[in-house]
């Protein structure tokens, strides 16, 4: 076999890296310990946790029906359907609130919030990972535990801002002209 050392394998591109020049891995690495670093600086949230009134739409939906807003967030983050996440959130909240009211006479209403916060903080963590966002203002669980509705609204605003949904106008579609067949 002539040219035994002439084969160079194709360039490896990790799935998580960006397709920019500084993030590319060299075809042949001299030192395997030296790897290109991804952008470690987290980007900032597009709005604050208490910026609900900057976006009246998400504020109203989040206050009236947080289950729907949570379902939209979960649907975007890969849960599959809006109905499944929305229903799970609503049923979990309703069931736990009912149980707490029955067993404690309505005295312990913080337990449902903590159970739903445990469920919802996973989606916040997934959103932060997806967009490289800081764990702010507190940890994911703490944020959902004490500011659940505000956290859901913030996550919704972030998804809408990053994906551009809701900000672009609907396309103008015109039907084709009417065509008729004439007899010869």
Curated annotation (Swiss-Prot):
One Gene Ontology cellular component: membrane
InterPro entries, sorted: PLAC_motif_containing (IPR006461)
Spans traversing the lipid bilayer: 91-111
Entry keyword annotation includes Amino-acid biosynthesis: no
Signal sequence coordinates: none
Keyword terms, alphabetized: Membrane, Transmembrane, Transmembrane helix
Superkingdom of this protein's organism: Eukaryota
Membrane protein topology class: Single-pass membrane protein
Family the entry assigns: Belongs to the cornifelin family.
Name of the protein described by the UniProt record: Cell number regulator 5
């Amino acid at each position: 076999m002539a040219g035994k050392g002439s084969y160079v394998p194709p360039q490896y591109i990790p799935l998580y890296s960006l397709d920019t020049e500084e993030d590319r891995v060299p075809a042949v690495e001299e030192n395997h310990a030296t790897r290109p670093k991804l952008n470690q600086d987290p980007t900032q949230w597009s709005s604050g946790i208490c910026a609900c009134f900057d976006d009246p739409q998400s504020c109203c939906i989040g206050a009236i029906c947080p289950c729907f807003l949570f379902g939209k967030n979960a649907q975007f983050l890969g849960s599959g359907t809006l109905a499944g996440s929305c229903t799970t959130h609503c049923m979990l909240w309703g069931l736990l609130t009912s149980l707490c009211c029955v067993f404690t006479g309505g005295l312990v209403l913080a337990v449902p919030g903590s159970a739903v916060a445990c469920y919802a903080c996973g989606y916040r963590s997934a959103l932060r990972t997806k967009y490289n966002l800081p764990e702010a203002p507190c940890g994911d669980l703490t944020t959902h535990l004490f500011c659940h509705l505000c956290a859901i609204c913030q996550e919704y605003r972030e998804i809408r801002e990053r994906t551009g949904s809701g900000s672009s106008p609907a396309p103008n579609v015109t039907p084709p002209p009417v065509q008729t067949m004439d007899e010869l």
